[in-house]
């Protein structure tokens, strides 16, 4: 796909090698997309063949929309009637999440048995495009009535950093994507560039900077209009 100027952006990332759908032999599909399981199997093969490597891996299994049929996707999730009526595609998304969990469990299990030191950084890129009615059922109120904290939490996605060797353990880390590369480098013990050092200092003041709001070091959830002059 060429959306978001990917064709040019991927070149600027300057990876030694790029792999796409056509590079996966006999992939296991879920719906019409390559499954997380097949995706991870390509990584296993690559890391077995190379002494060291860095992957930026984007999976497609759970891409919207969620009314594409159930090919190779077992039905496990049944929502309450009010949520089902608000968005009849939500169950498919949640079943896809279950398949992702199973593949992720396999990924972590695989690298936990490897002698080569391995660091996995896992994060989602955005919330699923379910209907506003679905989210309003979850909140029990109109989306227009959400607090800044609720808006930010709706857009939040899970992430973790895992290693098959000892690293500092942290829980409930608040961070926006612009800082994640810095945290990864710090966790891996890699040197920071000057720009990354700037981001590391900024993170101590404002750990989440997003288009829909900000989180301060003392845990305040603020709109842009609520930022102090110093924060701006």
Predicted segments — roles?
Residues 1-232:
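Solvent-exposed soluble domains appended to multi-pass membrane proteins
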């Amino acid at each position: 796909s060429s959306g978001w100027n990917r064709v040019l952006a991927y070149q600027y990332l300057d990876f030694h090698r790029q792999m796409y759908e056509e590079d996966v032999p006999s992939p296991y599909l879920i719906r019409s997309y390559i499954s997380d399981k097949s995706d991870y199997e390509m990584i296993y093969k690559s890391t077995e063949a190379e002494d060291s490597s860095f992957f930026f891996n984007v999976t497609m299994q759970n891409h919207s929309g969620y009314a594409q049929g159930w090919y190779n996707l077992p039905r496990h999730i049944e929502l309450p009637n009010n949520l089902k009526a608000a968005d009849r595609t939500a169950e498919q998304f949640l079943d896809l999440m279950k398949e992702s969990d199973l593949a992720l469990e396999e990924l972590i299990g695989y690298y936990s048995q490897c002698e080569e030191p391995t660091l996995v950084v896992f994060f989602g890129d955005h919330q699923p495009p379910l209907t506003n009615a679905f989210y309003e059922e979850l909140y029990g109120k109109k989306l227009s009535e959400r607090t800044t904290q609720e808006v930010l939490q709706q857009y939040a996605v899970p992430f973790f950093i895992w290693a098959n060797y000892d690293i500092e353990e942290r829980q409930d880390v608040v961070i926006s994507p612009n800082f994640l590369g810095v945290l990864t480098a710090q966790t891996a013990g890699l040197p920071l560039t000057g720009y990354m050092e700037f981001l590391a200092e900024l993170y101590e003041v404002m750990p989440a900077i997003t288009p829909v709001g900000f989180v301060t070091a003392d845990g305040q959830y603020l709109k842009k209009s609520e930022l102090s002059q110093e924060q701006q």
